[in-house]
Amino acid sequence: LVGSEMCIRDRNKSNILDIIRDIKDGKMVIIIDDESRENEGDLVCAAELVTPEIVNFMASKGKGLICLPMSTSLCQKYNLQMMTNNNRATNKTAFTVSIEAAEGISTGISAADRSHTIKTAVNKNSKSSDIVQPGHVFPLKAMKGGVLSRAGHTEAACDLAKLAGLQSAGVICEIMNDDGTMARRDDLLKFGQKNNIKLGTIADLIDYRLSMDATVESVLDKDVENEFGEFKLNVWRDKIRDEYHFSLMKGNLKSVESPLVRVQTQSILQDTLGIDELGKNWSIRSSLKRIANEGTGLFVLINHKDAKSYWLNKLEEKEIEPKSNRRVIGVGSQILRAFDLKKISVLGTPTKYNAVSGFNIEITGFVNE
C-alpha cells in the first residue's frame, strides 16, 4: 500500500461504489487525498443536492473553507475569471472570483444563503445573470479529465457527482480539529465514525475511473533503434486534448523490482539547441543514454506547450513562474500505469511529485548521476 492507502486500512474505508451511492443520495462523504500532497480530508457532497443543513455542518463541524468545485463548462457559463493569473500556490488550486446568487438571499453568508447560491449556480435552467460577483461562495475550476488529470479534491468532487448522474459540481470543506490544526489520518477516521460519514480515497477513485475511461490510450507500438540501441516505442493519444505523447522502453520492465523511469517535457533550449537549461540536468539524449546503460528502463516524453514568452524570459534570465506539472503528472502516471508499474526509481533530482501515489505508484528513490 502506498500514499493515502497507507493511512487507511481496508476495513476503515468504503468501496468507491458505496461512496458514489451516498453522493447520489445527497449525503456527505469524506475524501482523503495523497499523503505526499495536502494529506487532508474534505467533506464532499453533490452541489445539486446541497442543503442548508449540509452547509451548516461543514461550517460548524468541518471548520474549513467551503468551496464549490465546478466543471470548466459551468465556469464558462458564468464567465468566472480566475482569482489570479499568477497562481503560485503549491497545489495550484484553481480559485475563481467568488460568487453570489443575484436574488433570494439576504447577507449571503448564512447556511441557507450559501446553499441557495450553490444550487442556483448548478441549476441547468439558471442564466448567467442569476449569479453575481463577488460573493460568499468560492468556486474552484476543475481540470478536464478530473482526477486522471489532477488528483485533487476539486476534481474528485466533480467526478463523484458526475458518476452519480448529477451535474459535474460538488461542495467541499476541509476538516479541521477542534484546536485549529488540520485533521489527519486517525483524526479523519474518528470524525467519520462519530458522524456516520463514509470515508474514501482519491486513489480508489482514480482506480475506478481508470477501469472505465482512462484519458490516455496507446495507438501504436513498434520496435525502433536509435544511437543508444533498441527500444520499444509507444505512441499515446491524450483523448481530452487530442495530443500525442511518446514512450521508449528498454528491456523487460518486469525483470526489475523498481525500474529506472524518466518522465519529462521537451526543452527547446536543451534538447533541440543543445543549450543547458538551468536546473535541468537531464536532456532527452542523456536520459536515453542512462537508461540504455542500465539495460532496463522507461522514458516518457509528454507533449507540453510552454507559454509564448517562456523561453525568451529564460534566455534573458528573468524571473519566471515555475512550470505547472499537474497535467504532466496525470498523463505520465497513466502511461506508467499502462505498463503495470508499481515501484519506480526516478531519473532526476529528488522532487515532491504530488499525487503520484494516487495512481498506486511508489517512488523508491532518485538517480541523478
Q: Where are each of the predicted segments found?
A:
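Catalytic domains of riboflavin
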Residues: 9-369
